[in-house]
């Protein structure tokens, strides 16, 4: 069973019902809806199709709505793409002007206030670089240092500059409300700079009466500096290596990735490695050897998930890409899973200690599964963060929890009715593993749950169960005949 999860960005190449079903069947665990592109009604149709494909397959598939963020972009060029040569003067202005080879507008009206002579600006993910030579109230005059083509709406990065854009643009606020209305499982916040950035998101969620887990995208130097605080404040992180590799030296990105994964695991929060994991498969049916190694190394670093962007949104081989990624992950886990480092430190909280004890007992007993019954998914994530070789099952009465656990490493989920007694939990477990042929009579299962059942965050029980144990089944039958007051 593959443990690390696969996040797929949905786009024109994969938004049909047939392609979405094929993605799910190939191994997609999370569907990413990129609100930088496409219309709301198109994305609503995609979400509905993903839910149907998930139901058809019987596998939980989560929806991640990725907010565009305050991305700084060029405006349009009246005569199409322009070629900039070394030494050319190129002015970026806040004025409303037709774009030319010498002058173009920007979406960020605060640009002159944030720039100073000597600053280096990068266009189109660094394919073009310019140096600021003069700043006025409305214009940033630059000289071209790295030549190339510029065209409509290309991104503009200011490495090392603390840009004064808000955490949420007006479009982001609209898209956040839309994502909540669509019952998204995760919201990804772009260009996070500090732990405080989650406050604006939570304010809108509280206005709408619903909290959804928020993933912080690590793509700014300020976020790297505040990484521990961001991991603590948010519900998960994404190492967005595209903008991160533009804003920071390329050679710094691998260690940022490793540190981010370690911190997220310690906090028992999901961590995604994103951008160019299988980039060549946008055009080619096979990845490069370097890409295969990159994917495998993200798994060995301990990532919960790896993400595909253009490979599945606009690529020529989206289904093949997911199958290839799944095969690389499975091979890496099967042949090198022991290389995934254990996380440092001790578990100080009660639930963490219980989960650690359960994992050790399961290994000593050679148990078939580690099992958790969970309302919120917390105990499942606590088991997941240890990256133990024993397969893990999570049972929950909540579909929302089941879908959110689709992003967590190694968790196979089942939705079951809510019960009032732990013996009933064990009976449910026995029925599922036998009917699904997951375990044989006599197999040992190590269970983590809370007493009384149904209270989120109450994991306080560890139990060993033998599949098919008639005595425990009789206990369930006895409880079925009792009144609630006797439990």
Predicted regions: what is each one?
Residues 1-487:
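Non-catalytic helical/linker scaffolds that mediate oligomerization, partner binding
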